[in-house]
């Protein structure tokens, strides 16, 4: 299980915004969120 985690650029608050069963799906979701949020958030994939 992989978590997609966001962090607002100006704070240190992390939030789990989605999850995926495989790494490839997690990367796809990460890319979609990066396109949607632009540079306001840092998006990371974290393995559980």
Which functions belong to the PLM regions below?
Residues 1-17, 23, 32-35:
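N-terminal acidic leader/helix
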Residues 13-14, 27, 31-48:
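Short, mixed-charge low-complexity intrinsically disordered segments
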Residues 21-22, 48:
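Intrinsic disorder/low-complexity segments
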């Amino acid at each position: 299980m992989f978590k997609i985690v966001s962090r607002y650029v100006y704070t240190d608050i992390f939030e789990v915004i989605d999850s995926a069963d495989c790494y490839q799906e997690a990367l796809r979701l990460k890319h979609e969120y990066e396109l949607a949020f632009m540079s306001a958030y840092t998006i990371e994939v974290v393995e559980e």
